[in-house]
Amino acid sequence: MPLMPKRVKHRKMHRGSRSGNATSGTYVAFGDFGLQVLDRGWITNNQIEACRIAINRYLKRKGKVFIRIFPQKSFTSRPPDTRMGKGKGAVEGWVAVVRPGNILFEVGGVTESQAREALRLASNKLGVSTRFVYRQGVQH
């Protein structure tokens, strides 16, 4: 089951602005280590799921993984070989809008080296640059 909202008020959305930095969700709150975004962009539900699988596969169900983003924006596309006009295309998928500073994933209950490697594997699945961060007060 892909990550997507159960129901939305308006199915088709504008692309919106991606300018500015993140104002919330910028610190590690649940786990001990996190993956922070340095770029701005869209992360699809499939990318989030691929990251989750990569982290869980490396950690072998030890520790706990927290997903801090949710794809709540729909994006549409037109079929190929279609002329302009005739309305907006069908919903193609769902994305999470991320800005510099957002925490994407958090890991707890594992060592720093395990968390670093798991989050490195996850960052390879993303189209944005990221960095490894610690929760405030964690010894490193």
From Swiss-Prot:
<dbReference type="InterPro" id="IPR016180">
    <property type="entry name" value="Ribosomal_uL16_dom"/>
</dbReference>
<keyword id="KW-0699">rRNA-binding</keyword>
<dbReference type="GO" id="GO:0003735">
    <property type="term" value="F:structural constituent of ribosome"/>
</dbReference>
<dbReference type="GO" id="GO:0022625">
    <property type="term" value="C:cytosolic large ribosomal subunit"/>
</dbReference>
<keyword id="KW-0694">RNA-binding</keyword>
<keyword id="KW-0687">Ribonucleoprotein</keyword>
<dbReference type="GO" id="GO:0006412">
    <property type="term" value="P:translation"/>
</dbReference>
<feature type="region of interest" description="Disordered">
    <location>
        <begin position="1"/>
        <end position="21"/>
    </location>
</feature>
<dbReference type="InterPro" id="IPR000114">
    <property type="entry name" value="Ribosomal_uL16_bact-type"/>
</dbReference>
<feature type="compositionally biased region" description="Basic residues">
    <location>
        <begin position="1"/>
        <end position="17"/>
    </location>
</feature>
<dbReference type="InterPro" id="IPR020798">
    <property type="entry name" value="Ribosomal_uL16_CS"/>
</dbReference>
<keyword id="KW-0820">tRNA-binding</keyword>
<dbReference type="InterPro" id="IPR036920">
    <property type="entry name" value="Ribosomal_uL16_sf"/>
</dbReference>
<comment type="similarity">
    <text>Belongs to the universal ribosomal protein uL16 family.</text>
</comment>
<dbReference type="Pfam" id="PF00252">
    <property type="entry name" value="Ribosomal_L16"/>
</dbReference>
<comment type="subunit">
    <text>Part of the 50S ribosomal subunit.</text>
</comment>
<protein>
    <recommendedName>
        <fullName>Large ribosomal subunit protein uL16</fullName>
    </recommendedName>
</protein>
<dbReference type="GO" id="GO:0000049">
    <property type="term" value="F:tRNA binding"/>
</dbReference>
<keyword id="KW-0689">Ribosomal protein</keyword>
<dbReference type="GO" id="GO:0019843">
    <property type="term" value="F:rRNA binding"/>
</dbReference>
<dbReference type="InterPro" id="IPR047873">
    <property type="entry name" value="Ribosomal_uL16"/>
</dbReference>
<comment type="function">
    <text>Binds 23S rRNA and is also seen to make contacts with the A and possibly P site tRNAs.</text>
</comment>
